């Protein structure tokens, strides 16, 4: 299933590890990043803006690092 605006998604850890996005982030990511779901707020090119179900800022991740929840 393609990722689109409003979709609930999960991060695929195997695709996220060693990516540019992972290297630019703190190595101690909180559990909700991999255990919970997030909602796609916007898509621009190869990136999707994700809002997790906790009160934290949104993040931009590559669409190929996400899977439908």
Curated annotation (Swiss-Prot):
It catalyses: a plastoquinone + NADH + (n+1) H(+)(in) = a plastoquinol + NAD(+) + n H(+)(out); a plastoquinone + NADPH + (n+1) H(+)(in) = a plastoquinol + NADP(+) + n H(+)(out). Its EC number is 7.1.1.-. It is found in: Cellular thylakoid membrane. It is a peripheral membrane protein. It is an enzyme of class 7 (translocase). InterPro entries: NdhO. GO terms for molecular function: oxidoreductase activity, acting on NAD(P)H, quinone or similar compound as acceptor; quinone binding. GO terms for cellular component: plasma membrane-derived thylakoid membrane. Its main location: membrane. The keyword Transferase does not apply. Keywords: Membrane, NAD, NADP, Plastoquinone, Quinone, Thylakoid, Translocase, Transport. NDH-1 shuttles electrons from an unknown electron donor, via FMN and iron-sulfur (Fe-S) centers, to quinones in the respiratory and/or the photosynthetic chain. The immediate electron acceptor for the enzyme in this species is believed to be plastoquinone. Couples the redox reaction to proton translocation, and thus conserves the redox energy in a proton gradient. Cyanobacterial NDH-1 also plays a role in inorganic carbon-concentration. Belongs to the complex I NdhO subunit family. NDH-1 can be composed of about 15 different subunits; different subcomplexes with different compositions have been identified which probably have different functions. This is NAD(P)H-quinone oxidoreductase subunit O. It comes from Acaryochloris marina (strain MBIC 11017).
């Amino acid at each position: 299933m393609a990722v689109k605006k409003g979709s609930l998604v999960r991060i695929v850890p195997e695709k996220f590890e060693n990516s540019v996005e992972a290297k630019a982030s703190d190595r101690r990511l909180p559990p909700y990043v991999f255990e919970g779901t997030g909602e796609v707020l916007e898509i621009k090119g190869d990136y999707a803006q994700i809002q997790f179900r906790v009160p934290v800022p949104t993040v931009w991740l590559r669409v190929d690092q996400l899977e439908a929840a």
